[in-house]
């Protein structure tokens, strides 16, 4: 015959089992939710990469996003079999690029101009045939808005011949600005550069031809690109104030991933 002590032990054991079962059920339901989110995110990201291939010039950012997308899908599939320590490591690896992207985004939204500057330097980006890409159009629209507030300034458009282009980036940019109503005589072309560094070096040389005693410039590029380009300008000795242009939301992953690597490369070899 069971004693009162045994009954208490039995009740306690039953309660513990119930708590354990509830906990396991809670974890399992949340595990399914997390896996579903990861799968959805991975496939959505792959679709985004495919779409970006149709509207932009391929960069290492495309490859990075595709690799991360596939990794998310596999992570979701094998989620239950992955040790807790690996889960923690993966979460950290996810947080790092997100935090870095937030930093670049906030930094790129700076507007330090006072609309009395001498020169506007617009950094080149992709050109398809003779048409500017959307990121480049955003940069040029920012330049138009600036010039309308300071029509005494000169605009230097920078960039050589790209992979998908039939004319130089500088020429395509000049045509766009003229189409937007900017007088041709205030537009200066730098059409030899192939990198951001060369953009800035050659643009600086052109600006000094018009302002031999020095000039105050405005640097226009997309928000994600502001940090690295302004640091390069400082390194070269170009006195510019940043003015970030917007970036289409659907191109954030590709552009920010690519820029993250570019910043790391710049920091290592600067």
Model segments located where?
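N-terminal targeting leaders characterized by basic, low-complexity, disordered sequences
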Residues: 1-26
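Membrane-interface helix-boundary motifs at transmembrane edges
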Residues: 27, 77-90
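Membrane-embedded alpha-helical segments of integral membrane proteins
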Residues: 32-77
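Helical transmembrane-bundle signal
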Residues: 45-48, 72, 97-104, 262
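Perimembrane helix-loop junctions in membrane proteins
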Residues: 52-55, 79-82, 104-112, 270
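Internal/C-terminal transmembrane anchor helices
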Residues: 84-105
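A structural signal for short, hydrophobic/glycine-enriched beta-strand patches
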Residues: 99-258
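A transmembrane-helix-recognition feature enriched in membrane-embedded lipid enzymes
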Residues: 252-270
């Amino acid at each position: 015959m069971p004693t009162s002590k045994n009954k208490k032990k039995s009740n306690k054991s039953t309660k513990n089992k119930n708590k354990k079962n509830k906990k396991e059920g809670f974890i399992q339901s949340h595990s399914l939710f997390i896996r579903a989110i990861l799968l959805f995110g991975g496939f959505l990201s792959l679709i985004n990469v495919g779409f970006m291939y149709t509207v932009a010039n391929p960069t290492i950012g495309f490859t990075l996003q595709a690799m991360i997308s596939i990794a998310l899908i596999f992570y979701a599939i094998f989620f239950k079999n992955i040790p807790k320590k690996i889960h923690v490591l993966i979460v950290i690896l996810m947080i790092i690029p997100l935090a870095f992207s937030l930093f670049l985004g906030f930094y790129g939204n700076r507007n330090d101009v006072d609309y009395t500057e001498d020169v506007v330097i617009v950094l080149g980006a992709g050109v398809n045939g003779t048409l500017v890409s959307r990121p480049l159009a955003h940069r040029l629209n920012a330049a138009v808005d600036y010039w309308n507030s300071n029509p005494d300034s000169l605009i230097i458009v920078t960039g050589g011949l790209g992979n998908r282009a039939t004319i130089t980036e500088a020429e395509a940019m000049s045509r766009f600005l003229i189409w937007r109503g900017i007088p041709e005589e205030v537009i200066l072309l730098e059409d030899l550069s192939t990198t951001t560094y060369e953009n800035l070096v050659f643009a600086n040389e052109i600006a000094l031809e018009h302002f031999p005693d020095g000039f105050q410039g405005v640097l226009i590029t997309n928000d994600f690109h502001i940090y690295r380009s302004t640091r390069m300008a400082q390194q070269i000795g170009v006195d510019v104030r940043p003015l970030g242009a917007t970036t289409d939301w659907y191109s954030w992953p590709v552009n920010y991933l690519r820029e993250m690597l570019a910043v790391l490369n710049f920091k290592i070899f600067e």
